Amino acid sequence: MLRNKKILFAFAMLFSSFVNARELEPLADFVHRNPQFMTQLKDSQMLVSRCSALYVVLSVRLNEMQYKKDGDDLIAHLTKASESYELGRLTLSKAGKYDEPSTRFLQKDFAKKYSNITLANWKKDRGIFEDLINEDLKVCEDYAPHYKKLAHNLAKYIGR
């Protein structure tokens, strides 16, 4: 009976991880499918909300794990990147299609999904930088300089 419960629990965790990962389209697929996304305000707002959420979740998870071994630099990097994307989210909200509460709600939804995925990854093999997390992190890292510059220029334009 206990063995069956363990098997059922393991299956539920695996299924939960799969469902959460499938709820989010990989950012690389999104960028490939929509190469002009940076010119679309709605798509840019989605990406900055999602990257901000990813960085927040990763920095919190690493703090929870008391990650060391150059971890302090990594946590500081993730926190700073989160702040940059948050500034981008706020600036694009002022200039854009969705107001700040809408993009904040979107960001919280992404954070919840990323949190579930990192927790499932941790329970599975004691690593959080797996699959979708690692793939999305690469996209967020690649686009961070572009969104930082865009947020800076938009802030000047809208008189922030």
Where do the language-model regions lie?
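Sec-dependent signal peptide recognition
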Residues: 3-10
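N-terminal signal peptide c-region/cleavage motif recognized by signal peptidases
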Residues: 16-18
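Cleaved targeting-peptide boundary
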Residues: 21-29
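Stable alpha-helical elements in mature extracytoplasmic
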Residues: 23, 44-51, 133-136, 143
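Short, charged/polar, low-complexity loop and linker segments
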Residues: 29-36
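Compact alpha-helical subdomains of small soluble proteins
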Residues: 78-160
